[in-house]
Amino acid sequence: MIRPRMLRSLLALLLGATTGCTTIQLGAANLIETAEVPRTEVAYGEGPRQRYDVYRALDSIGRPLTTPAPVVIFVHGGSWESGDKRGYAWVGEALAQLGFVAVLPNYGLMPSTRFPEFVDDVARAVAHARARVTEWGGDTSRVVLMGHSAGAHIAALVAYDARYLATQGTTPAILSGFVGLSGAYDFLFDTKLLRRTFAGPPEREHDALPVHFVTPRSLRTLLVMGEDDRTVNPRNTRSLAAALRKAQVPVEEIWVSGTHGVSVGAFARINRGESEIVRRIAAFVRATP
């Protein structure tokens, strides 16, 4: 039998003290998530990855809520070239147990889907889910977009660059806030991965950086970052927070000890009961803008 202290240490190693989020790490979090949460898969387009999972909000004893619940649309990471919504089922189940409707979309991945097409996918999923979320008990006045790592980058573009949701006939005003977990928002194209994904004409590189699209009308924002992150430089969070403050947009920051997985790892079952990250994100989601 694995004792709780041993399990906590293992999960801390896998999710908090690593340089990235691998299949093994995600599998560990899924393994210990034992809740039975109603899940529905929905197609938002015709592509094989144009689908999202919906997790119904639960009350304190595990029953589906009967009153409208806040909604969190969570975009997974994976360096724009890997990852899957089912690998993050534990995040959807955690959000549901916190009393939220959780929507986890897949999106096209590199190299078959290039920038900005994968951002278009997420915008399409956001608009589609927002239009239907009352079917699953969601409160349309409280729909927060959240992402981790590359998913935070994509989600930030959808949240701040109004052109993406405009192609879906709507605006970022349908959202009540943005939460970024260890996200890339203001970076140099100084690695093979980043050049392969984003480099090109100046306008393309400009459009790849969420920090360029902050305005006084931008969504209120909560940013979470590990102080020792070596996968995404913490300067990304500092730069975005500074731009938001300059535009007088409400922004909160949570800085914690740990590396790249620590922000999303807070939602793992063994962590979330005492996590400041989870507590503050939950309060942010529940708040009425």
Locate predicted features.
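N-terminal cap/lid segment of alpha/beta-hydrolase-fold proteins
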Residues: 22-64
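Mobile cap/lid helix-loop segments that gate and shape the active-site cleft of serine hydrolases
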Residues: 47, 183-213, 219
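Short beta-strand element of the alpha/beta-hydrolase
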Residues: 66-78
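Short amphipathic alpha-helix adjacent to the substrate-entry channel of hydrolases
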Residues: 86-104
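Alpha/beta-hydrolase active-site loop
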Residues: 113-133
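Primarily recognizes the serine-hydrolase "nucleophile elbow" in alpha/beta-hydrolase
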Residues: 127-193, 205-206
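Short beta-strand/loop motif that positions the catalytic acidic residue
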Residues: 217, 223-225, 229
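C-terminal catalytic histidine-bearing segment of alpha/beta-hydrolase fold enzymes
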Residues: 238, 245-289
